From Swiss-Prot:
It is found in: Cytoplasm. This is D-aminoacyl-tRNA deacylase. One of its GO terms (cellular component) is cytoplasm. Pfam families: Tyr_Deacylase.
Amino acid sequence: MKAVLQRVAEARVVVAGETVGQIGQGLLVLVCAERGDAEGQADKLLAKILKLRIFSDEAGKMNRSVQDLDGAGKQGGLLIVSQFTLAADVSGGNRPSFTDAAAPDEGRRLYDYFVAQALALHPMVQTGQFAADMQVHLVNDGPVTIPLHIDPAA
């Protein structure tokens, strides 16, 4: 499973002119299920995201996670957006191939599982809309952008 995290001051997802998900300070999580992924990869990816220390402490060092933005338990938001294009392979030319992405039904199942687990473990979760044409608006904080990959064999 792959994800790209963007530390944001705020972010929102718009579908057909309507905002479907919105957060303040937190993480925009673009996520992609790959062929061979299962719940184990989703669990490992989510655990890493929730514990990743990419928010600044009082000294300006990246020592805080989305679960503890201020050292006193303030939690940031997660805006989770499905993005199968993270599985793009351009090694064979200039047109991306997406054969490494999970099949649409399996991708939706794993995305839904990932979101359900996030909702169970974190109080501030919003989402995009699976397989929709989305406009993602964000104010990148830093900028800080982190790619993550949990191997399907993991």
